[in-house]
Amino acid sequence: VTSPAHAPAAAGPRTSWRRRWVLFNLLMALFALIWVTVHNIFWGTPPPPDQEPGLFPERFSAAERLADQFSYFTVWSATLVALAMALILVRPGTRSRVIRVLHLTSLVMITITGLVYWTMLAATSTDLLSVGNLSLHLFTPVVTLLTWLVAGPAGWLELRLLPGILVVPALWLVFTFVRGAILGVYPYGFINLVRVELGEVVRFVAQVLGVAVVLGAAYCLIDRVLPGRARARAGRIIRAVTERTPVGRRTTE
């Protein structure tokens, strides 16, 4: 009999198929980050027409273009996903509060990345179907959510972790607005204080932070109520695809 302290629902992805799923999530995020880094920094390509003015000028050095790249919320989100997946792989059975907060933060931030892009930015994007764009704004968000739903870690998320998910977005906001005040450049038009009134920017930021808290709470509740059998069934389907075992067969985990 498995004791509650060692129940599979509360543990990290120890089984091979779960680890492969988490590893795929990690590689997806890393691929997206490496692709856009090479494209934006080392190729030195001119910015697309829909780029905010002042970002990625051809005369900038690689270090300056790297700073431009990390002004994007999207890049912070994908970086956090990669970090969270790496920590889950290295410490699958941990109950570290810091790692659980990072995992929840990555889920929330990458979800917001996808939602904001596809509802507010995609319509005017000039590189909608590019490899880097789809990797960052579609594949990484979808794979990250599927990984959590199917492979876990399950039972990690709690409502008391919610205050912690605002730390990284707050750091991004401080970096973005301090840098914008100094250089006069911003990553997104809707927070560009050169063209948008402060009150509108504050309202938008407050709304996004509110959505972040709601998403975080929703993920905590889903993690609490999602039946273990549903995850186990999903796991058997994944194993049937990846290991070619019959879906109905129960394998030892």
What is the predicted role of each segment?
Residues 95-109, 158-166:
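Interfacial segments of alpha-helical transmembrane regions
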Residues 117-126:
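Juxtamembrane "helix-exit" motif on the non-cytosolic side of transmembrane helices
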